[in-house]
Regions:
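Conserved alpha/beta core of the MobA/IspD/sugar-nucleotide pyrophosphorylase nucleotidyltransferase superfamily
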Residues: 164-212
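Acidic donor-binding segment of Leloir-type glycosyltransferases
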Residues: 47-72
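Short phosphate-binding loop-to-helix
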Residues: 64-99, 179
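A short, N-terminal amphipathic alpha-helix
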Residues: 32-48
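Short, glycine-/small-residue-rich phosphate/pyrophosphate-handling segment
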Residues: 124, 144-166
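N-terminal nucleotide-binding beta1-loop-alpha1 segment
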Residues: 1-19
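Short aromatic-hydrophobic micro-motifs that form the base-stacking/packing surface
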Residues: 101-103
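Conserved donor-nucleotide/metal-binding helix-loop-beta segment in metal-dependent transferases, i.e.
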Residues: 110-136
Length: 212
């Protein structure tokens, strides 16, 4: 089964605005770059992932993605996340991919074993595999097979909406709860938790150690 990983990326200098009270703009930019690099390194050379597709309107993010061997789609204007993901999925479908894995670039603890766990649950389509955030409100990873089976509905409360869409489509629903997939960096308390786990300081933007 061929799976493409789609990684949506906000402009590196604008992402993580809710951390503005904790990190400076330069520190947030550096953090966003490190998180993207970690995500790309985690996905690279995984036999379960045929191709990585990064979608962004930030030339710097797209250039970094290409340095890691990823394909890129540059957004025109300022489309909503769900619209950008739909366009990226169409690109993946042109290459006859069977499934797509949407993976935001703000999961500092994600490992290759996490990716394998998601793909393992995607056997025998039609299937939708969802990894919720630690509050079980948002969607931190979404694997859809076949690609295009359900509409994207990211945003506050997206976990339940994606579950509902999977059931409405008659797909098997698989929910994967893993601590490393549940923690995304959105709020100051998320950053504090990661720094505490890794024994780092705020001035040292975190990237999880690569796991083979």
């Amino acid at each position: 089964m061929t799976i493409w990983a789609i990684v949506p990326v906000k402009p590196l200098r604008r992402g993580k605005s809710r951390l503005a009270g904790t990190l400076s703009e330069d520190e947030r930019t550096h953090l966003n770059q490190l998180l993207l690099e970690h995500t790309l390194k985690t996905l690279t050379d995984l036999k379960e992932i045929e191709q990585i597709l990064v979608v962004s309107r930030d030339p710097a993010a797209l250039a970094l993605a290409r340095e890691h061997g990823a394909r890129t789609v540059r957004e025109a204007g300022s489309p909503k996340l769900n619209t950008a993901l739909k366009r990226a999925t169409v690109v993946a479908q042109l290459y006859a991919t069977r499934g797509v894995l949407v993976l935001p670039a703000d999961l500092p603890l994600i490992t290759r074993e996490d990716i394998r766990a998601l793909v393992k649950r995607a056997k025998k389509p039609p299937v939708v595999v969802i990894a919720p955030d630690r509050r079980e409100e948002g969607t931190n990873a979404l694997l859809i097979c076949p690609a295009g089976l359900i509409e994207y509905d990211f945003g506050p409360g997206s976990f339940q909406r994606h579950c509902d869409r999977a059931q409405q489509a008659g797909a098997r629903l698989e929910v994967v709860n893993l601590p490393s997939l549940g923690l995304d960096l959105d709020l100051p308390e998320d950053l504090e938790m990661v720094l505490k786990l890794e024994g780092l300081q705020v001035e040292e933007p975190f990237v999880a150690e690569e796991t083979a």
